Amino acid sequence: MRFSAATVSALAMALTVAAAPGNTAKEALAKRTDDLTVADAQNICGKDLSVNCCNQVDASTNNNDNSGSGILSGILGGVLGNGGLKLTDGCSSIGVGIANDLLNSQCKQSVACCKTDGNTASGLVAVQLPCIPISGLL
């Protein structure tokens, strides 16, 4: 095989770019959430969930070791991975009247999407989830 100087140069440049240090996942997530407005967050949450500011993240739901049995265990394990799903607690709603404000100016804790009526779980699977951090939905 015969490589031209341009091919070798292009390959070397591509490897250099691939090896360059990048942002950590936490920094990248912070950049994405810093520019969100309350209206953007509501669009991410959808019409059935409301944007909330939460005080705590429940670490007991942060692990998904796929040790459970049942139909959803394998499906959720494949979707969520080993990081699991972080659920939140101590949440209060962020008003819709401030839709154009930046989200980080309204909430310094964890921003989450919460079920509006919180008391009912209906449907085929009927899983009642409390609040889910918006960072997990981005």
UniProtKB/Swiss-Prot annotation:
Q: Among its keywords, does the record have Electron transport? A: no
Q: What job does the chain carry out?
A: Aerial growth, conidiation, and dispersal of filamentous fungi in the environment rely upon a capability of their secreting small amphipathic proteins called hydrophobins (HPBs) with low sequence identity. Class I can self-assemble into an outermost layer of rodlet bundles on aerial cell surfaces, conferring cellular hydrophobicity that supports fungal growth, development and dispersal; whereas Class II form highly ordered films at water-air interfaces through intermolecular interactions but contribute nothing to the rodlet structure.
Signal peptide (from-to): 1-19
* Main localization, broad class: secreted
Say what happens when this gene is deleted: Leads to slightly enhanced mycelial growth, small conidia, slow spore germination and appressoria formation, cell wall integrity and virulence. Reduces the cellular lipids content in both mycelia and conidia.
| Name of protein | Class I hydrophobin 1
Q: Which organism is it from?
A: Colletotrichum siamense
Which InterPro entries does the record match to this protein? Hydrophobin, Hydrophobin_CS
Subunit field text: Interacts with the lipid droplet coating protein Cap20.
Disulfide-bond pairs as recorded: 45-113, 53-107, 54-91, 114-131
Q: Which GO terms describe its molecular function?
A: structural constituent of cell wall
Q: Does the keyword Iron apply?
A: no
- Could you list this entry's UniProt keywords, alphabetically sorted: Conidiation, Disulfide bond, Lipid droplet, Secreted, Signal, Sporulation, Virulence
Family membership: Belongs to the fungal hydrophobin family.
GO CC terms of this entry: extracellular region; fungal-type cell wall
Q: Where in the cell is it found?
A: Secreted; Lipid droplet
